Amino acid sequence: MLDLKIIPNTINSSDFHIFFCEKNFSFNPKKLTFTNINYKEINSILFKNKNEDYFVFNYHSTRPKKIIFINQNEYKNNFENQNIGGKVINEIKSAKEINVIFSKEDKSLENFYFNFFLGSFLKKYSFNKYKTIFKKNENINEKINLLISSKNKNFFSKIKNDINNIVSGVFLTRDLVSEPPNYLNPQAFVNEIKKLSKLGLKVEVFDHSKMKKIGMNALLGVAQGSKNLPYFVTIKWKPNNSKNKKPLSFIGKGVCFDTGGISLKPAKFMEDMKYDMAGAGVVVGLMKTLALRKSKSYVIGTVALVENMPGGSAQRPGDIVKSYSGKTIEVLNTDAEGRLILADAIYYIDEQYNPEFIIDLATLTGAIVVSLGNEYAGLFSNDDKLSEKLINVGEIENEKLWRFPLHKNYDKLMDSKIADIQNINYSGGAGSITAAQFLQRFLKNKTPWAHLDIAGMAW
């Protein structure tokens, strides 16, 4: 766990220092007064390594014991800066305080500083709440202070605040995805979401009876095999001075555990299916960060929370359900459950809020992992402009997206003989595409929509 502290031109007697040089490792030698190591020796070694991102000096017999020199060159994107910060913080073990010194502070490098420290924070994340036995000297819960020596307190305080707001949302998502399924069932997930109300988010929860009353039968069908009841939750952020009249909508698949239902998954690696709620986790983390940052945008986050279990009352292959949209769905495979809960969620949000766009995030298909592995998420969309924006942002943040086709000719693969639509392409092939084609049928309006299949990226 990291914390940034700004101390005006003060250098503590720490064993560890991070020293930000200027371009090509050039630096002001007067800034090295905290050590008696040879300036010429350092300068010579750094010059030979001027193309590196950072360089580590270890001094076992003097203080400080370690100095990491950072090369303030221009970098291509935010992720590269974050990666450097993560690597640097990983070089320092068992430190309680780390001094951060600048040869020359450059406010034009705010983006570099921000992403460097953001990467450091993200690197130090760990999930160990259920561990009671630790290795010797394994101080993973200890707080580490990064002590920034600077006169520009306001400048670095803003960076610190922005980082804390982002990290708070990211770590909430990581915690939710990491929780074991016997702890994070749908009710427990709802309890975590309700805690966000104190940030100014408006949380509305539909329970089983409410969903049954309004006809969310596609969602309810998935949940009927589990003793843990399902929930449908909307999380609204609407500032008084919002810059958009129509909300931006984000919908997350929240299958808290997926056995496959009656169409049971293989036992091997089934434990990983606790992550089948990752899309919902992303949406909840996003909404927390938006609230902390006092976003000017009107945003609605939606999560559909269920367990997919093979109980005595479980949905059967061959069942037909009437969705919230009124369309009937023949359930040929109960392990294609994510699209069923998203069908009700998408139609409800489109009908009730008429949003500016809808983006759904779901660990939807194994087929996307076959296609893209763990490097790209699949992108499916009815709108070129929305797709382009998502792809561009993904490149900057290293959350890479690859766009797949949508075409009406795929629809025949999902047509049912006895219902309006079936939930799988029974003949096989184009698994991720036909899943997206299925979802597209549950847009009520011509709303710009993007489906992100994150099955290969979320865990």
Ranges and model annotations:
Residues 1-2, 62-63, 173, 190-459:
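A generic structural signal for tightly packed, nonpolar segments enriched in small/aliphatic residues
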Residues 1-254:
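Short amphipathic alpha-helical segment within the helicase RecA-like ATPase core
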